[in-house]
């Protein structure tokens, strides 16, 4: 799913959402009450951690969004773990908890074996066609490996929303996605046609070209974001979080619309601007 991971846990008497980097996320924590009854779940299960994905066009981190979330954000749970251990709650028990507490989840496709490859390929092709990221295969026997399979379209979208700041990412990020897209092509006996090549080229070059053009003209490379929060005080906390994470974010506007504070901000992508400017100005660089 095209979003960002969070881990939700009760610490003393409060429930927090943590990002993959182990930071408390003020935005995600603010919005938890909109996703499920966190009070009831954690009062009855204080030792558990709910793992999931927050996705949608109005999030503060990710410009990519699944096609079925067209505004704001939604939460999709995929795991439950036990605090202070490596233990993952078994799948059937996990699903029972999701259903009991009405916690929204990622799509569940059911049980499959190696004899179901044809049916799985059909699912994967549909996901690719519908603009979805892919499938995660989770073992019923915990010691076995978990496997993630992504679609070619997901690889192109990943590159398309990041190539404008390519210099801020490790080269492996793009290399892995190009390889995955080609693996997808071969596994599904699809042709390396003009459509595929056009998507690959545009996802890599078009956003980067726009960044080069801006930097060459002395214009800062930026990303624009919109988010909604329940409490005004959490707007300040969100920007303190950005500062802590060394994200150069500037508030553009905030206004109360209905029950939410609608916030717009801009992230200045100075590292990308600086590198491109230096190259454009004639500084030497080494391959």
Regions inferred by a protein language model and the residue ranges of each:
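Core nucleotide-handling region used for phosphoryl-transfer chemistry
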Residues: 1-5, 9-287
């Amino acid at each position: 799913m095209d979003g960002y991971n969070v881990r939700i846990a009760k610490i003393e008497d409060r429930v927090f959402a943590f990002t993959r980097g182990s930071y408390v996320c003020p935005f995600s924590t603010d919005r938890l009450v909109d996703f499920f009854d966190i009070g009831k779940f954690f009062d009855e299960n204080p030792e558990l951690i709910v793992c999931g994905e927050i996705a949608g066009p109005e999030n503060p981190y990710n410009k990519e969004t699944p096609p079925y979330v067209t505004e704001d954000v939604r939460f999709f749970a995929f795991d439950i773990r036990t605090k202070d251990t490596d233990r993952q709650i078994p799948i059937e028990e996990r699903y029972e908890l999701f259903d009991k507490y009405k916690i929204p989840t990622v799509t569940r496709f059911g049980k499959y074996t190696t004899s179901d490859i044809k049916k799985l390929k059909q699912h994967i092709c549909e996901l690719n066609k519908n603009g979805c990221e892919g499938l995660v295969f989770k073992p019923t026997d915990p010691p076995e490996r978990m496997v993630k399979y992504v679609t070619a379209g997901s690889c192109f979208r990943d590159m398309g929303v990041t190539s404008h700041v390519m210099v801020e990412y490790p080269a492996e990020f793009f290399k892995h996605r190009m390889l995955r897209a080609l693996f997808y092509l071969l596994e599904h006996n699809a042709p390396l046609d003009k459509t595929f090549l056009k998507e690959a080229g545009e996802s890599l070059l078009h956003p980067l070209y726009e960044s080069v053009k801006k930097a060459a003209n002395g214009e800062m490379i930026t990303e624009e974001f919109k988010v909604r929060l329940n409490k005004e005080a959490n707007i300040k906390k969100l920007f303190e979080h950005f500062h802590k994470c060394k994200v150069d974010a500037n508030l553009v506007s905030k206004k109360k619309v209905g029950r939410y504070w609608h916030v717009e901000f801009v992230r200045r992508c100075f590292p990308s601007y600086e590198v491109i400017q230096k190259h454009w100005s004639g500084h030497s660089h080494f391959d």
